[in-house]
């Protein structure tokens, strides 16, 4: 296994460094070959659209690329599977996100890495650059700060804002749960659910499960300290939403008889013995990246009736936000939706 990941690492480093470094670039959308082209593109012709936009800001969507441009904003404080690696180390991830916007939805995206941890300052930065963009994609900002940043920007900006770790993950995981339940022959509303991880993605998934009809009492949330219960002190408001009254101490205890495991946490958090205690036809969504909560081979060997998915593209049943966020933003940009609400999700 170590050799496999060593090979993947070397391949990835070569992929990113060969030719022009990185994964995104800028290409002109209008001709710039002649003196007349340049006169129209910049001085003096550019004054005409500038005056039009000053008179009517909506004309920015007619004369500029604003309506097809998204900012991918991160401070690198909570990169899935990598943790707090900071803004510079997060840049390859955000460039990758920008590339996926272009590849799957034709959306231009700039990665904006912000060297800041104060939520109010991040909010200020995003609001200051918002006139440039048709939408804002918040990415890999740690909880609980991310909740405040997301809520404020969604309320205060007139363009669509998505914290993809929350809303994008919840959409795709919910789709996987609906389809997995069909395969397992189970009703979604009767699923007994364990979510491992209590950050932005976990809370958003749990909230979305409520909209699918799963009762709050059937959802157990686990974090690095074990099961999130009502008897624990110091819970964040978001964790309090899903604190269980059941006397459970560990992930292993919570999984006894569970129908669904959703992992948005860390590698190796789940063991084959835990999987074997789950209900018939268990759904295991091990979504930590780059390494899932349980390795693919170990999961498949744990029991023959498992329905297993990861966040990786090199294994079957990939559950990844790329199945959702490009198309959600495509629709939101096309109709200038703000904000993006639960019904759209």
Predicted regions and their residues:
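Solvent-exposed alpha-helices and their adjacent loops that cap or buttress functional pockets
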Residues: 61-66, 102-103, 128-130, 154-155, ...
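N-terminal ligand-binding/catalytic initiation module
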Residues: 1-159
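Rossmann-like adenosine-cofactor binding region
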Residues: 240-307, 312-316
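Glycine-rich phosphate/diphosphate-binding loop of Rossmann-like nucleotide-binding domains
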Residues: 80, 87-105, 163, 167, ...
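Glycine-rich phosphate/adenylate-binding loop
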Residues: 6-11, 280, 336-345
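General beta-strand structural signal in soluble alpha/beta enzymes
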Residues: 111, 137-140, 161-164, 195, ...
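Adenosine-phosphate binding glycine-rich loop
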Residues: 164-165, 184-186, 286-345
